[in-house]
Amino acid sequence: MKKIVILGAGIGGLSVINEIRESGVPLDDLDITVVDEDFAHFLGFTLPWVMRGWREADSVPIRPSAQALSGINTITGSVTGIDPIARTVTLSDTSTLSFDALIISTGARNALDKVPGLAESAARGDAVHYYSVAGAGDARRALANFSAGKLVFLVTSQPFRCPVAPYEGALLASDLLSEKDVRSNVDLSVYTPELHPMPSAGPYAGPQLVQLLRDNGIAFHGEHRTERIDPDGKVVVFADGTTVSFDLLVFVPPHEPSVTIEGSGWIDVDAETMQTRYDGIWAIGDTAAVTSPSGKPLPKAAIFAKNGAKAAAQNVLRYLGRSDRGGALSGLGYCYLDTGQHRAAQGKGDFFSLPHPAITLTEPSSSQHHDKQDEESQWRAMWESRSGA
């Protein structure tokens, strides 16, 4: 009996389960265990909807049913360590799991303390984010009560989950303020360390998005690396010494991997197989660091967690001698960008193309917003339904 351990039951981990089931490989002699802190996850693109007021926070979590996870061992707990030599995983209750193959899909977590003053500003209510369910609820309340002044959207550091999220958030905030008939009272801007939005998408989508921001009266300021926040003065201080004041700050939190191997930092993987430098260990999704053929980092986005799961699952089965077929990570990806008024644009293409990706944005439409809604509905039905995945 070969033991497969999957860390994380989010989009990546669940996709691994689905890929193994659909592989056609007999599962009788495979012992599959998935570990997760609470077996509740969400699609990241639903959080801006909560901030905008289109969804309630408690409607966002997706909890896989027992039927959907039938035949899979489930352990609720946190991972505190991985020993790649002994091939064991240590959990918060000090118990250990041994494995023949390990797939790490634990994602990224918010790390506000990495920027001095940020946590204090958030505690005071002057700074909010929408990178967690609770955070999105806080941002919703803050924007609902905001009617005049300087509203600053800030990308505190790179990398971060969902490349379009900061700009989508600014567009939806503008949409909300217009709906409240107070948009003319608000100075709305975005600051980011990026040269332009979506740099991993190539040279075209970013300028398109900047123009979309400008069309909505949102100022874009690239190449601004955050140094610290002054909570008393309500000021962002950048690395070059420049500053911007705010009445309300909506920020993308600093990110760090939820789980890593032997130290800290994102887990480097082979850009084709998703295998780490350790035999029998793969990493996928947000926790993995993938460099595309053009030298750009692969975005931390749900589609690439799914693509990585497909490649890793096939390679695990081959590694365990259950299949002759390996898998390679696909660079084909897409994302939707809500622009307001229940309309969305889409960026889609091959992030592995050379000499660089050539992603462009489509014109916003209501049909693309509905497509985005359908994507969540289909994923939710797959895992919450009685029929399972």
Predicted regions and their residues:
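Beta1-alpha1 glycine-rich phosphate/pyrophosphate-binding loop at the start
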Residues: M1-N73, S157-P203
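Short glycine-rich anion-binding loops that position phosphate/pyrophosphate groups of nucleotides
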Residues: G12, A40, G107-N110, H255-P257
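A Rossmann-like FAD-binding core segment of flavoenzymes
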Residues: D29-T33, S70-A86, L97, D175-A271, ...
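FAD-binding core/adjacent interface of flavoenzyme oxidoreductases
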Residues: I72-E168, D175-D181, V250
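Glycine-rich, N-terminal phosphate-binding loop of Rossmann-like dinucleotide-binding domains
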Residues: D93, T106-G107, D240, P253-P254, ...
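FAD-site-proximal beta/loop scaffold in flavoenzymes
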Residues: E120-S147, T243-N307
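Internal hydrophobic alpha-helix adjacent to the cofactor/substrate pocket in enzyme cavities
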Residues: D175, F304-S330
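C-terminal auxiliary extensions adjacent to catalytic cores
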Residues: A345-A389
